[in-house]
Swiss-Prot record:
Organism: Ruminiclostridium cellulolyticum (strain ATCC 35319 / DSM 5812 / JCM 6584 / H10) (Clostridium cellulolyticum)
Location in the cell: Cytoplasm
GO terms of biological process kind: chaperone cofactor-dependent protein refolding
Quaternary assembly: Heptamer of 7 subunits arranged in a ring. Interacts with the chaperonin GroEL.
Any one of the GO CC terms: cytoplasm
Species lineage: Bacteria, Bacillati, Bacillota, Clostridia, Eubacteriales
Protein name, per record: Co-chaperonin GroES
Keywords: Chaperone, Cytoplasm
Record GO terms (molecular function): ATP binding; metal ion binding; protein folding chaperone; protein-folding chaperone binding; unfolded protein binding
Length: 94
């Protein structure tokens, strides 16, 4: 089974953030911010807004930066994913 997002939504898997600061301080789980770098695992077909087709600008495998608190977190087959709209993606990391 797999997740197939609808419209202009994408499914992402957050990538782990550093647990130690550059100066060597280890951060406890409660002090870490939600990671903002993710990998796209599924992409919806796009959508139509005001009669114009909105194409998807990202593809499976892209690494992206997301807004900190955007999307809906879901658990599927023992994995954690976030489903969000393409507009909540800030940039593609190359």
């Amino acid at each position: 089974m797999k997740i197939k997002p609808l419209g202009d939504r994408v499914v992402i898997k957050m990538l782990e953030s550093e647990e130690t600061t550059k100066s060597g301080i280890v951060l406890p789980g409660s002090a870490k911010e939600k990671p903002q770098v993710a990998e796209i695992v599924a992409v919806g077909p796009g959508t139509v807004v005001d009669g114009k087709e909105v194409k998807m600008e990202v593809k499976v495998g892209d690494r992206v930066l997301t807004s900190k608190y955007s999307g809906t977190e879901v658990k599927f087959d023992g994995q954690e994913y976030t489903i969000l709209k393409q507009g909540d993606i800030l940039a593609i990391v190359e």
